Amino acid sequence: MECKERRLIGDLIALSYVEGLPVAEAAKRLCVTRQGLYKLLKQLRNEGYVAEGPLIKITQKGRDLLSSVLRDLLRYFNIASIRLIGRVISGLGEGAFYISLEGYRRAIEEKLGFTPFPGTLNIKLDPQYLPYRRYLDGLPGIVIPGFTNGLRTYGGVKAFKAKINGVEGAVVMPERTHHPTDVIEIIAPVKLRDALNLKDGDIVEVEILL
């Protein structure tokens, strides 16, 4: 990590709490003047860490820097799990199809230790948890191998054992997915919507075991 990146880390962490807000509101929440925040944003935009526009938006370069800091901190403090919070959203129904496939089902039983309910619970993460989500991309996780059934090839899946509002399950991260980065898919031996009495918009807590 370069010296200039070290100097910007605190500023990026602060901006991560106000991402998506206009400058005036962000300045108020950060307890700084608008002029001071405009000056900081200009510097970060010149460095490529913040995008141009009326709303505060951290670029991929900025997210990568925050993820690297998070990785170092978790390693230093020997943290064995991370917590994500988000809201339940409806999916496209694809999870039920894929989880029902024999190749995936058997591998999940072997690798994760449970027979999955044929379906996934989709969670849209709150913005402040996205660095943790991106951190998972750099971890090996538990590999659910891809397979072919003679007609089609299905890609591999990376998984992490997890607890969803206390219920054991796993976060799955397919090699091929239509979901944006802020959406995670969860599998469990039970239908989580019924077991936890969840509906769209409900807040859930996911503890991911590293």
From Swiss-Prot:
Q: Which UniProt keywords apply?
A: Flavoprotein, FMN, Kinase, Magnesium, Metal-binding, Nucleotide-binding, Transferase
Please give the family membership noted in the entry.
Belongs to the archaeal riboflavin kinase family.
Q: Which reaction does it catalyse?
A: riboflavin + CTP = CDP + FMN + H(+)
User: How, per the record, is the cofactor bound?
Assistant: Binds 1 Mg(2+) ion per subunit.
Which segments carry the region annotation Riboflavin kinase? 82-210
Which Pfam families does the record associate with it?
A: CTP-dep_RFKase
Identify the InterPro entries for this entry: RibK_CTP-dep, Riboflavin_kinase_archaeal, Riboflavin_kinase_CTP-dep, Riboflavin_kinase_dom_sf, WH-like_DNA-bd_sf, WH_DNA-bd_sf
Q: Where does FMN bind?
A: 177, 185
- Give one GO term, molecular function aspect: riboflavin kinase activity
What is the name of the protein in this document? Riboflavin kinase
Gene3D superfamilies this protein is in? Riboflavin kinase-like, Winged helix-like DNA-binding domain superfamily/Winged helix DNA-binding domain
Q: Where is this region: H-T-H motif-like?
A: 1-81
Kindly list the positions annotated as binding CDP.
91-96, 190-193
The protein's gene is named: ribK
Q: What does this protein do?
A: Catalyzes the CTP-dependent phosphorylation of riboflavin (vitamin B2) to form flavin mononucleotide (FMN).
The cysteines joined by S-S bonds are: none
Q: Where does Mg(2+) bind?
A: 120, 122
Q: What is its EC number?
A: 2.7.1.161
Q: Name one GO biological process term.
A: riboflavin biosynthetic process
Q: Which residues cross the membrane?
A: none
